[in-house]
Amino acid sequence: MAVFVANESGANDVDEVRLTALARFVLDAMKVNPLAELSVMLVEEKAMADLHVRYMGEEGPTDVLSFAQDDAFDASWSESVDDDPTTLLGDVVLCPDVARRQAEQAGHSHERELHLLCTHGILHLLGYDHAEPDEEREMWKIQNKLLASWDTAVKAAGGKRPAGGADGADGAGEPGPTAAR
């Protein structure tokens, strides 16, 4: 699974390696086709506010936006692969400054908030939504379970920063945590 993280926010307190590992972990736990690609972009507040107005019609910056590349894309893993085995799942855009404020309000770390938002954005790309109360309950339940599994995997790895994704395949020689299924 290819996960690309680009930090264009100017925030120097974002652990991009760990964010990449988390995204791979979530994709693996959700049984997304291992040939899918995901990009995660971290942007400044102004850029996020511009995206928020342009695509959601709402003023001001938000914490996370998701942009699916192909609404018809079946993200589930399959034994059969089309002629083009690589499919773009989509983009998750995060705003570290908004996440920082939300983390302070929630009483947890900035990194924890970014992990929550990245997981949330990925779930949107996989078709989850929270427009209705029952959808919201389901999405939050899955989101919380994924984050708890991530925490358990990180603790099992001795608290080390996971260098790899759920499969540990990043070429760094340090395995990442394995997704709980």
Swiss-Prot record:
Domain of life: Bacteria
Binding site for Zn(2+): 120, 124, 130
Enzyme class, UniProt record, top EC level: hydrolase
GO cellular component, one term: cytoplasm
InterPro entries registered for this protein in UniProt: MetalPrtase_cat_dom_sf_prd, YbeY, YbeY_CS
Transmembrane segments: none
Names of the cofactor(s): Zn(2+)
Keyword Hydrolase: yes
Swiss-Prot/TrEMBL keywords: Cytoplasm, Endonuclease, Hydrolase, Metal-binding, Nuclease, Ribosome biogenesis, rRNA processing, Zinc
Pfam families, A to Z: YbeY
Molecular function, one GO term: zinc ion binding
Task performed by this protein: Single strand-specific metallo-endoribonuclease involved in late-stage 70S ribosome quality control and in maturation of the 3' terminus of the 16S rRNA.
Family: Belongs to the endoribonuclease YbeY family.
Name of this protein: Endoribonuclease YbeY
Originating organism: Frankia alni (strain DSM 45986 / CECT 9034 / ACN14a)
Gene: ybeY
